[in-house]
């Protein structure tokens, strides 16, 4: 959040997508998956405050609830679409088409379905980064990061405590935490169950996860 306030929100989202691309490249070139996932997660964590924070800079307070609803709805839709797309990318049909692509004089060294899928994700993040460059400057004054980042911890604790003590804040935080916590765990449970009980492939199980999510 402090990083999102220190720079224009569009630039923060651009840099965040760059971090995600770096994480994908790390996995593509053999870095331990846990480390690569951590880098991608860092980019996603930095992206979210800017994504929501820019609404307060672009819109009047009377439209924030409506705008937040659109953001939440599109986020959920993108997650479902991402699960379906990921399942298709590692499936035999799509991966065979991707691996059969031949670029003259270019050796991509991409020889497996996961590598092809990660390459497509890199292009998706590049497209998202291009859209980030089209976000206009809002003219809102920036708040510089403190010299000692540790000082952000007491501020975070204070803000978090105030939210949980507020009745409407409690409802919002509890509902959001429950929703994302349950949906995140359910996704992996359905994937594992579909493979063990139904004998589904990753592609088929991903499609089932999309249906369950809807």
Each model region followed by its residue ranges:
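Helix-loop interface residues and adjacent transmembrane-helix termini in multi-pass membrane transporters
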Residues: 6, 30, 58-61, 111, ...
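Juxtamembrane intracellular "pre-TM" segments in multi-pass secondary transporters
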Residues: 135-175, 197
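Hydrophobic alpha-helical transmembrane segments of multipass integral membrane proteins
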Residues: 18-25, 119-129, 214
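A single, central transmembrane helix in multi-pass transporters
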Residues: 90-118, 161-214
